């Protein structure tokens, strides 16, 4: 009995949320390539997120997330989701120095998105924070 009342207060049965289909012919693709992962975000021209994917959300774990193939799969997944909303052309903005940055751009083009421009927006410090120490293996 208590379970029924608590469910009614929440609004009844939970319905699966349906993603509404937008019509966005041109947008932006942000590729954030770190040494551990690659995140691909596709937005409309105003910056509102249409679709996103990452190597981790594409099923890769651990050191496999940092491979170019994982970045390719992540970019394909994000492109497929964005093309469902009508996206055809993208301006690509790349940030970071990870292994997957080149492969992610190629995957966006191979998925059917027309790459209009590629801009590197990697932040470069003017001698700010001290970088991490070098790895010794």
Curated annotation (Swiss-Prot):
Residues 1-25 are annotated as: Disordered. GO terms for biological process: translation. GO terms for cellular component: ribonucleoprotein complex; ribosome. Keywords: Ribonucleoprotein, Ribosomal protein, RNA-binding, rRNA-binding. The keyword RNA-binding applies. Residues 15-25 have a biased composition (Basic residues). Pfam families: Ribosomal_S11. GO terms for molecular function: rRNA binding; structural constituent of ribosome. InterPro entries: Ribosomal_uS11, Ribosomal_uS11_bac-type, Ribosomal_uS11_CS, Ribosomal_uS11_sf. Located on the platform of the 30S subunit, it bridges several disparate RNA helices of the 16S rRNA. Forms part of the Shine-Dalgarno cleft in the 70S ribosome. Part of the 30S ribosomal subunit. Interacts with proteins S7 and S18. Binds to IF-3. Belongs to the universal ribosomal protein uS11 family. This is Small ribosomal subunit protein uS11. It comes from Thermomicrobium roseum (strain ATCC 27502 / DSM 5159 / P-2).
